[in-house]
């Protein structure tokens, strides 16, 4: 039966004139198959790190797939096709040799044709390198630098754990997510430790208008500060890194100076006067490299300093205000908020990694699915072909046996015929098995890395055993211990998290955040180990209680960890369970309010169960007493005393789990016992209610105390305000008095000046009068005086008339 029509014939015209002239033996074909498998086993592919592989070829060339090339001809000629002609030639030669060796069986040729076509299809689907990128010699597959069997390299010539990377100058403005700049030194007046929301920071204290230095160094040797334009901004110490606003004067001044090599930059910073609203606030200086044309920040070339606090004088550093101690509830809330924030950051990082892997590995996943489908199809075709071939061989063997039997029956007697039949069958079976084994060996040598098919028998019962290799099935199968599965996975996650670089904008505190997350993870691991130890203790308790079988053990109670009615370790186990519940409720504040009602419900259920058990015990005792005979009445007082003792100590009887009665009890006494049990239960219930009331009172007292403290604080605040108002009034009065005194002094000075001016003016007036009198002197000897002054009055001039 011909099976070659299921496969397409291969046109050898595309591969030159080598397909028809070459001929090799079966041994050479087997050796070539083993060499190809060895070369493929050296190939290591990591699909999840495909985005980290370096493209060493030219930019216009496409990146090679992670599959070695088998385009090596024995004569050393190069071939640029997608499938090596050597594979096709060897497969065709296998067909020829098998046809020459096994002419007696026609179906063996069909088997070889099917298997060889299968290998050619497989090689054409997997070997798809680009043309002219790999050489033909087998040595170049492993020794050449462009071969894909080399280990995976990281982009920009760096390893996974190295903090620094190198890149070409063309990638400078685009950049990568890695930091290429770092702070080597930051000067300050004093360095303080400051904690907020459970996060501790190193704060650098700086005096305003006084310079402090910041030294930057490059991690990329291809960069140079002489060719870069840095820019510095003053931002708030927050997640958003908002820039500090300014109206007229910029809050920050800076001067830059680079060394001769250009790998180190010194910045002299000077913070100006800030408003009063920004006192006691933390700032940061953001240094970024800017494009000189567009003034836009270049990605990967920015750095943020440590937190900075500004003071007006150096003396203010020594004067630290005494801060009031915070309440423990506030600190707990801060730590919970910090844990929530860290969990959100971890979820964000995990989502980022997950989406990154999905986006980068879609093509590889599609290729893997296609390869798996092809493998399945090829395996099914191989199985069907082998089954058909084996059936055909069996039919031929049966026909040959029948022909031989007929010939032997015609020539010899019955006894000789039987012997000849056995010998002929043995010879035919040996020839068929040898031919089948040879064909199957050739097929297995060509397809050893995909499927291993072993034909154990060529008779009616043929067993096909398929063994997939490590390249197909046994990849990425994690083996974890049953006990430490969660713990080991958690530790691996923490190790990977430590290796991650700082992706947050807070570059200075990124490493600190990672360390805090790692410390929290270590504490969680310790808690898990403690839980395991406690669980082992619980198992030991169960073993101890389970060993004491008898009257003390009864039906299994779902609430108790063991099968005993009264477990001696019950209190310890309950205490451990309560501690676990309280601890886990700390991390779920929404469920914290439901702890108390759940505990009260559990107590009520336990009480109801105890009452039911006591009632059942009483009923059993009544039945036993009705069966027994009444005894003498003289023993009644003793029975009453025993009953009273039993009523006083019901808990001890429950712990022992046994009640022995040997006397008769009246129904009245039974009623009294029931009443006593009910009273005891009521007393227990009352005690529980009292305990609850006491707890409520205690909570109310604490609430009142808190209110009183708040009122006292409010009163203190009012007193402080009043005191401040009084001081302000006194200061105003003092200012007014000073102003009045100044006015008085000014008035006095003015009066003095006026007096001095008047005193200076008085002698001048006298001199003027004297001058006037001198001018008014009359010469009586001359007669012209009367002519000049006809109306003169001598009395006015001080002269008397003669």
UniProtKB/Swiss-Prot annotation:
Spell out the Polar residues composition-biased ranges. Answer: 69-88, 129-142
Q: State the tissue distribution.
A: Expressed in the prestalk cells that constitute the slug tip (pstA cells) and in prespore cells (at protein level). Not expressed in the band of prestalk cells that lies behind the slug tip (pstO cells). Highly expressed in pstO derived papilla cells during culmination.
Map out region (Disordered) in residue numbers.
1-148, 154-173, 381-446, 636-658
Q: Which GO terms describe its biological process?
A: cell differentiation; cell surface receptor signaling pathway via STAT; culmination involved in sorocarp development; positive regulation of gene expression; sporulation resulting in formation of a cellular spore
Task: Kindly list the GO molecular function terms attached to this UniProt entry.
Answer: sequence-specific DNA binding
**GO CC field:** nucleoplasm; nucleus
Phenotype on disruption: Mutants fail to culminate. Development is normal until migratory slugs are formed, but slugs lacking cudA fail to culminate in the dark or in low level unidirectional light. In overhead light slugs lacking cudA eventually form defective fruiting bodies that lack both mature stalk cells and mature spore cells.
What coarse category fits the chief subcellular location reported for this protein? nucleus
Compartments (UniProt record) = Nucleus, Nucleoplasm
Q: What induces it?
A: Induced by acaA in the slug tip. Induced by dstA in prestalk cells, but not in prespore cells.
Which keywords describe this protein according to UniProt? Answer: Developmental protein, Differentiation, DNA-binding, Nucleus, Sporulation, Transcription, Transcription regulation
Q: Where is the composition biased (Low complexity)?
A: 25-63, 89-128, 381-445
Q: What does the UniProt function comment say about this protein? A: Essential for normal culmination. May function as a transcriptional regulator.
Protein name listed in UniProt: Putative transcriptional regulator cudA
Q: Which organism is it from?
A: Dictyostelium discoideum
Q: Which gene encodes it?
A: cudA
């Amino acid at each position: 039966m011909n099976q070659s029509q299921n496969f397409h014939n291969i046109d050898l015209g595309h591969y030159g004139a080598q397909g028809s002239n070459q001929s090799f033996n079966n041994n050479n074909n087997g050796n070539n198959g083993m060499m190809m498998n060895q070369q493929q086993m050296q190939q290591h592919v990591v699909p999840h790190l495909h985005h980290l592989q370096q493209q060493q070829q030219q930019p216009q060339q496409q990146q090679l797939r992670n599959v070695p090339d088998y385009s090596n001809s024995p004569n050393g000629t190069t071939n640029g096709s997608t499938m090596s002609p050597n594979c096709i030639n060897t497969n065709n030669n296998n067909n020829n040799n098998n046809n020459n060796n096994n002419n007696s069986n026609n179906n063996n040729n069909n088997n070889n044709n099917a298997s060889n076509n299968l290998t050619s299809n497989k090689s054409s689907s997997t070997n798809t390198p680009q043309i002219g990128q790999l050489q033909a010699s087998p040595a170049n597959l492993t020794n050449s630098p462009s071969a894909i069997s080399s280990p995976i390299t990281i982009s920009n010539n760096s390893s996974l754990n190295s903090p620094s990377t190198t890149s070409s100058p063309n990638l400078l403005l685009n950049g990568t997510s890695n930091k290429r700049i770092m702070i080597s030194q930051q000067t300050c007046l004093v360095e303080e430790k400051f904690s907020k929301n459970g996060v501790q920071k190193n704060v650098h204290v700086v005096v305003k208008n006084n310079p402090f230095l910041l030294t930057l160094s490059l991690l990329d040797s291809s960069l140079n500060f002489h060719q870069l334009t840095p820019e510095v901004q003053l931002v708030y110490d927050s997640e958003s890194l908002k820039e500090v606003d300014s109206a007229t004067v910029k809050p920050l001044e800076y001067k830059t100076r680079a060394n001769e090599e250009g790998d180190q930059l010194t910045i002299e910073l000077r913070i100006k006067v800030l408003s009063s609203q920004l006192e006691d606030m933390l700032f940061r200086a953001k240094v970024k490299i800017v494009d000189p044309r567009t003034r836009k920040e270049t990605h990967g070339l920015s750095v943020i300093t440590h937190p900075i606090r500004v003071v007006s004088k150096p003396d203010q550093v020594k004067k630290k205000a005494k801060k009031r101690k915070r309440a423990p509830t506030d600190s707990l809330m801060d730590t919970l908020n910090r844990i929530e924030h860290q969990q959100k950051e971890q979820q964000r990082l995990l989502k980022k990694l997950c989406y990154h892997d999905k986006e980068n590995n879609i093509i590889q996943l599609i290729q893997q699915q296609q390869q798996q489908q092809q493998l399945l199809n090829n395996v099914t075709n191989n199985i069907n072909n082998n089954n058909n071939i084996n059936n055909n061989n069996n039919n031929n063997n049966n026909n040959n046996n029948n022909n031989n039997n007929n010939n032997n029956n015609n020539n010899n007697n019955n006894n000789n015929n039987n012997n000849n039949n056995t010998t002929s069958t043995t010879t035919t079976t040996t020839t068929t098995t040898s031919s089948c084994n040879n064909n199957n060996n050739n097929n297995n040598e060509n397809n050893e890395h995909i499927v291993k098919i072993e034909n154990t028998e060529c008779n009616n019962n043929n067993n096909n055993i398929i063994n997939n290799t490590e390249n197909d099935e046994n990849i990425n199968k994690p083996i974890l211990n049953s006990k430490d599965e969660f713990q080991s996975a958690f530790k691996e996650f923490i190790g990977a998290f430590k290796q991650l670089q700082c992706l947050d904008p807070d570059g200075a505190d990124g490493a600190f955040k990672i360390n805090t997350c790692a410390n929290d993870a270590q504490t969680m691991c310790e808690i898990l180990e403690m839980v395991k130890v406690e669980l082992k203790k619980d198992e030991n308790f169960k073993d101890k209680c389970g060993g004491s079988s008898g009257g003390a053990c009864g039906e299994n109670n779902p609430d108790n960890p063991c099968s005993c009615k009264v477990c001696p370790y019950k209190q310890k186990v309950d205490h451990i369970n309560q501690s676990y519940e309280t601890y886990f409720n700390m991390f779920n504040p929404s469920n914290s309010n439901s702890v108390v009602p759940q505990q009260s419900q559990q107590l009520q259920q336990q009480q109801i169960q105890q009452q039911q058990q006591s009632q059942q015990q009483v009923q059993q005792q009544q039945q036993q007493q009705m069966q027994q005979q009444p005894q003498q009445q003289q023993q009644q007082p003793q029975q009453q005393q025993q009953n009273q003792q039993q009523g006083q100590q019901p808990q001890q009887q429950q712990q022992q789990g046994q009640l022995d009665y040997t006397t008769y009890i009246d129904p009245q006494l039974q009623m009294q016992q029931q009443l006593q049990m009910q009273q005891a239960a009521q007393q227990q219930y009352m005690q529980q209610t009292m305990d609850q009331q006491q707890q409520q009172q205690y909570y109310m007292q604490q609430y009142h105390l808190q209110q009183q403290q708040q009122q006292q604080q409010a009163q203190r605040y009012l007193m402080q305000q009043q005191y401040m108002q009084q001081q302000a009034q006194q200061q105003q009065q003092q200012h007014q008095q000073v102003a009045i005194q100044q006015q008085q002094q000014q008035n006095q000075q003015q009066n003095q000046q006026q007096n001095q001016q008047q005193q200076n003016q008085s002698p001048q007036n006298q001199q003027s009068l004297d001058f006037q009198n001198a001018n008014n002197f009359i010469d009586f000897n001359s007669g012209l005086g009367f002519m000049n002054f006809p109306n003169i009055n001598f009395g006015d001039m001080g002269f008397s008339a003669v």
